[in-house]
Swiss-Prot record:
InterPro entries given in the database record: DAP_epimerase_AS (IPR018510), DAP_epimerase_DapF (IPR001653)
Record's catalysed reaction(s): (2S,6S)-2,6-diaminopimelate = meso-2,6-diaminopimelate
Main function: Catalyzes the stereoinversion of LL-2,6-diaminopimelate (L,L-DAP) to meso-diaminopimelate (meso-DAP), a precursor of L-lysine and an essential component of the bacterial peptidoglycan.
Native organism: Buchnera aphidicola subsp. Schizaphis graminum (strain Sg)
EC number(s) reported in the record: 5.1.1.7
Gene, per the UniProt record: dapF
A Gene Ontology term for the protein's cellular component: cytosol
Lineage: Bacteria, Pseudomonadati, Pseudomonadota, Gammaproteobacteria, Enterobacterales
Family: Belongs to the diaminopimelate epimerase family.
Pathway: Amino-acid biosynthesis; L-lysine biosynthesis via DAP pathway; DL-2,6-diaminopimelate from LL-2,6-diaminopimelate: step 1/1
GO biological process: lysine biosynthetic process via diaminopimelate
Protein's name in the database: Diaminopimelate epimerase
Binding-site residues for substrate, renumbered to this chain: 21, 54, 74, 84-85, 167, 200, 218-219, 228-229
Site (Important for dimerization) location in chain: 278
């Protein structure tokens, strides 16, 4: 039994969270290992592994314009395009590990590149780029008009809006955040054939033009305490529909974020905290 450990690779990691959205953060800059889908699934198990919503992998960048390359894997081992809360945690990880010594970090990703800035109030700002309402940015099986999209679920049409924040989001406006059918509708939309690669589903209640409440059902994960890209998506839709101003507080189950967007042709900014929980190592 114990001899098996000699055959395994020891890797060091940090457990972190952004407003309750929790991560296992690993760097492959100073250590060498191979991650497979099954390994990630085992690591994500909250009873027998580390347990997390997503695994964040930091790699060397092949482009001199960027400090590092950043990859995101859901708990089921699937690689995804974007994670706003994760980006803030990656920034804090790089700072705590002494891998960076400047206030602004440039990260390349598999889809959209992002920049991270450390603020004077211990918050972290992420430039999430301009939201996209273009069909080609969202994997969908039929042509639709994005701001007038409805899908038939449970014998009724559900009105929602679609937007990409580097990853696909469906935003639904609700009257009650507590009574929103997050799990029921989230599962139905995620598995709907109209979204062949799945979809993140946000349920947004508008309090006023500067304040919303939000719950998010994340693709491959389920409802989480917080979703940074989901907050960006909800605010982008709200601003595009003239429901919100350009500076919005977003209340999530795990805390709040500030989202700023001046509108089309401008980048969107997310501001919030990141927390380091503990460091550890595990054999894979």
């Amino acid at each position: 039994m114990f001899s098996n450990y000699k055959k395994k690779k020891k890797i060091y990691f940090s457990k972190m969270h952004g407003l309750g959205n929790d991560f296992m953060v690993i760097e492959s800059i100073k250590q060498d290992f191979i991650l497979t889908k099954s390994i990630i699934e085992n690591l994500s198990n909250r009873n027998t592994g580390v347990g997390f919503d997503q695994l964040l992998l930091i790699e060397k960048s092949n482009n001199f314009k960027f400090d590092f390359h950043y990859r995101i894997f859901n708990a089921n081992g699937n690689e995804v395009e974007q994670c706003g809360n994760g980006a803030r945690c990656v920034g804090l990880f790089l700072f705590l590990k002494g891998l960076i010594n400047k206030r602004k970090i440039m990260l390349s990703t598999n889809k959209k590149n992002i920049s991270i800035k450390f603020m004077s109030d211990n918050n972290i700002q992420v430039n999430m780029n301009e939201p996209s309402f273009k069909l080609e940015e969202i994997s969908i099986s039929k042509k639709i008009v994005l701001n007038n999209f409805s899908v038939k679920l449970i014998n009724k049409n559900l009105k929602c809006s679609l937007v990409s924040i580097g990853n696909p989001h469906c935003v639904i406006k609700v009257e009650s955040i507590n009574n929103a059918p997050v799990k029921k509708i989230g599962e139905l939309l995620e598995k709907n054939s109209i979204f062949p690669q799945g979809i993140n589903v946000g349920f947004m209640k508008v309090i006023n033009k500067n304040h919303i409440q939000l719950r998010v059902y994340e693709r491959d994960v389920g409802e989480t305490q917080s979703c940074g890209s989901g907050a960006c998506a909800a605010v982008a839709v709200g601003i595009a529909k003239n429901l919100l101003c350009d500076n919005v507080k977003v209340d999530l189950l795990g805390g709040n974020l500030i989202i700023k967007w001046k509108g089309f042709n401008y980048p969107l900014y997310m501001i919030g905290t990141a927390c380091h929980i503990y460091d550890g190592y595990i054999y894979i």
